[in-house]
Amino acid sequence: AKNGPMLRVLAIVLLVHFGESFRNAVSLFFIRDIVGVPTIGAAYFFYFIAGFAAIPFWLWLGRKIGKHRAFMCTLITVAAVSGANLFLENGDYSVFFLLFIVKGFCFGGLQFLPIAMLADVVDVDSARSGSQRAGTYFAFLGFSEKIAIAFGTGVSLNIVGLLGFDPSGGVAASTDVGVWALRLVYCLGPIVFYGLALKLIWNYPLTPARHKRLQERLARRTERLAATRAHSSGAGQSSARPAEAASPWPS
């Protein structure tokens, strides 16, 4: 039988990573040419520091309100930051750094909450099939991420290039349409894909209550299997003892 939650998680991951790569492909150009930030390395340093520091928070929030709801909070926050970037002008360093750090704060949620959701999905498969196929599921997740990143990057760069943005010459060498294309791709492009992902997360079927019942079912199955094995092992040992006693060979 098909694993509905698994297919939904894969679709969500595809959309989110497509949106992220759609923006990331042109991040350097937006930061350098639109905002004019002179120290891009410093921006990314604080971005990743905020991201790694926030991982425990997002995992805690996932346990508190449910992983899919926490992931919704992550996407809504990132979408709001993306929309706010549209109003930045050259020289708005402080506002950009603030928004960039907030986006970095959400990095942990974007990366780890889908993995946590997939771990729950593995339990659905285990309950239905009785087997452990976590490795296969995570391989599918990794493949989906790579597909989304490849397509998102290619589509994004081609759009801004075809509409007149010149990466080597920056704003001065680009058309007005090309500069606006860069703004829209960086700021609004991800929001489209986040919105589609949010629609799938909104009525996500594997709620915390359902997952708890599923875990209890798996625990009962494990206990029954352990009891059956113990009974079979005990029966085998007891049947072997008379044969040993009746052996005609001297000890």
List the predicted regions and their residue ranges.
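Short, intrinsically disordered terminal tails adjacent to the first/last structured region
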Residues: 223-251
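Membrane-embedded alpha-helical bundles of multi-pass transporters/translocases
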Residues: 1-228, 249-250
